[in-house]
């Protein structure tokens, strides 16, 4: 594994997981609001 590749991949993975986490949390809030 090339170190430079890891340096590039790590922030991308962090950003992607953070975005998915936020989208999932918003989706759950919307579903809870609709189900009420």
UniProtKB/Swiss-Prot annotation:
Keyword rRNA-binding applies: no
Cell compartments where the protein resides: Plastid, Chloroplast thylakoid membrane
GO molecular function per UniProt: manganese ion binding
Segments on the Lumenal face: 1-4
InterPro entries named among the record's database cross-references: PSII_PsbY (IPR009388)
Transmembrane segments: 5-23
Location (main, coarse): plastid
UniProt GO BP: photosynthesis
Ranges per topology, Stromal: 24-36
Keyword vocabulary terms for this entry: Chloroplast, Membrane, Photosynthesis, Photosystem II, Plastid, Thylakoid, Transmembrane, Transmembrane helix
Membrane topology, record value: Single-pass membrane protein
One annotated Gene Ontology cellular component of this protein: photosystem II
Record Pfam families: PsbY
Assembly and binders: PSII is composed of 1 copy each of membrane proteins PsbA, PsbB, PsbC, PsbD, PsbE, PsbF, PsbH, PsbI, PsbJ, PsbK, PsbL, PsbM, PsbT, PsbX, PsbY, PsbZ, Psb30/Ycf12, at least 3 peripheral proteins of the oxygen-evolving complex and a large number of cofactors. It forms dimeric complexes.
Family as reported in the entry's similarity comment: Belongs to the PsbY family.
Function according to Swiss-Prot or TrEMBL: Loosely associated component of the core of photosystem II (PSII), it is not always seen in crystals. PSII is a light-driven water plastoquinone oxidoreductase, using light energy to abstract electrons from H(2)O, generating a proton gradient subsequently used for ATP formation.
Protein name (Swiss-Prot/TrEMBL): Photosystem II reaction center protein Y
